[in-house]
Regions:
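Conserved N-terminal beta-strand and adjoining loop/helix that marks the start
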Residues: 1-23, 40
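Unchanged
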Residues: 41-64, 75-125, 147
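Short, solvent-exposed loop/turn elements at beta->coil junctions and helix N-caps
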Residues: 68-74
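Charged phosphate-binding loop/patch that engages nucleotide di/tri-phosphates or the phosphate backbone
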Residues: 123-147
Length: 147
């Protein structure tokens, strides 16, 4: 394949879980959806550098990655997301241009406030499997089972 359709983007997201077992989610300003903080990697940064940058930009928090918990491909947009379970290591929640709001949610609340394709990222981060989940979705719904 040639042209723009042949290219993929890589994104990263951090599922920040606090000492009470709650997950930080942000409400995106661009679409109003709740999801884990994250975004597209820049070409010249490592995966971990991008993760730390994106979480800090969208929340004000400094985090420590604990584990890669999932790899997700948006089949419609060609975006591959690497999602990490993280713990807070500093900083403070800060208003910014990307997040309209913040919430600390329980694992059980994820499906109620976000599309399946994004809720599953939260749920997968709570699993204690040695292997990360590998899933495909259409931007809203899963289209393949977990591995």
């Amino acid at each position: 394949m040639t042209g723009e359709a042949a290219h993929h983007s890589v994104s990263v997201a951090g599922v920040v879980i606090d000492e009470n077992g709650r997950t930080l989610v942000i409400q995106r300003r661009d679409n109003g959806h709740w999801e884990a903080p994250g975004g597209i990697l820049e070409r010249d940064e490592s995966i971990i550098e991008g993760l730390l940058r994106e979480v800090r930009e969208e929340t004000g928090l400094i985090v420590e990655p604990v584990a890669l918990t999932g790899v997700y491909k948006n089949m419609r947009l060609g975006v591959v997301a690497l999602v990490f379970r993280c713990r807070e290591a500093g900083g403070a929640l800060t208003e910014n241009s990307e997040a309209a709001g913040f919430r600390w949610i329980l694992e059980s609340e994820a499906r109620a406030i976000m599309p399946e394709a994004f809720a599953v990222r939260i749920l997968d981060a709570y699993r204690n499997d040695a292997e990360p989940a590998i899933r495909d979705h259409d931007g809203t719904k899963l289209i393949t089972p977990t591995r």
